[in-house]
Amino acid sequence: MGNKLNLGLVFGGQSGEHEVSCVSAYNVLKVIDSEKYQVTTIGITKKGKWYLYAGDYEKIKDGSWEEDIMHLTGDFSFFADPIFSNIDVFFPVLHGPMGEDGTIQGVFEMLNKPYVGCGVLSSAVGMDKVFSKVMFESVGIPTGKYFYFRENDWQKDKENLADQAEKALGYPIFVKPANMGSSVGISKAHDRQELLESVELALVFDRKIILEAFVKGREIECAVLEEDGQVKASIPGEVIPSKEFYDYEAKYSDQEDSKVVIPAQIDEKAMAQIRDYAVKAFEAIEGSSLSRVDFFLTDSGDIFINEVNTLPGFTNISMYPKMWEATGIEYKDLVERIIESAKRKRVTVQL
């Protein structure tokens, strides 16, 4: 017991990806070696309340953990509670705002504790679809055409902004919250009316909106793993969505119709280029630990980066662990390597 690493696994969160986080956490918890790790599970409700949870992991998966009051402990001072001070490494299995945007990473830095995942800066940049594209372009990675604005600008002159977007991008246009993942709040607009409606939907999730030109191509993803400064890219995989695009439902509910092909059936040149771009993108945002990088591959062979996910999903159908399995690292080994690498990582802020 005394030789075990004290691991604090954080799940849930306040974002629209709360449910995905819970499923990912369940899958990670299932494979953690109890002989090596003493796990403290820390749940965050959608309202932002923090609880220590000591109940059945199945209740994390189905979201009923908040009702399991016999196994909840709350109303504690996060910084003062000895349970937190005794944690050796934090593993945030969180997605979206307040989870992979640098917010909780800053908390871990203030606690002077190592943690799984990218740091504060890289998490924030990776979460913001506009800033990340600027960084990708700076290192020569092709991006598709895009246009962005903030909510106050939209409310002042939405018709003018719509005119500019149509001229710059043409239809169809993908409308996205700038800071959200798992395709939450994303729509595909085919005309002016759909564009206006799609922006209003996206504004529910963020005050900054990015519009992207449609890229006709295959959706190729690549997993990145960093261990002690060495960055590796997995064999890429392809997503074949059952709908017009790989939306939230297709990613996490529509398992029967949406398909993934690993390795992606692409030529060696494209595969090598995608793996190279994945590493470059990861390094461009100064990433650490892990990320998943998404691309489009057109029929003419052009490659465009879509986005980087600094805390990719770990559900049973998530691409990140599946791509590493195809590359030769099993799910359980992958989780352990990520934790062990985090343990050796120096916290950037020393108090």
Language model features: what each stretch is:
Residues G2-F11, S15-G16, V23, F84, ...:
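Active-site nucleotide/adenylate-binding loops and adjacent lid/helix of ATP-dependent enzymes
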Residues G106-Y115, D191, L196, A326-T327:
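A glycine- and small-aliphatic-rich helix-loop capping segment at beta-alpha/alpha-beta transitions
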Residues M1-V116, V120-L121, V125-M127, F131, ...:
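ATP-binding N-terminal substructure of ATP-dependent carboxylate-amine bond-forming enzymes
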Residues S187-D276, L297-F304:
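Phosphate-binding site of ATP-dependent enzymes
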Residues V39, P114-Y115, T143, I173, ...:
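Hydrophobic beta-strand scaffold residues
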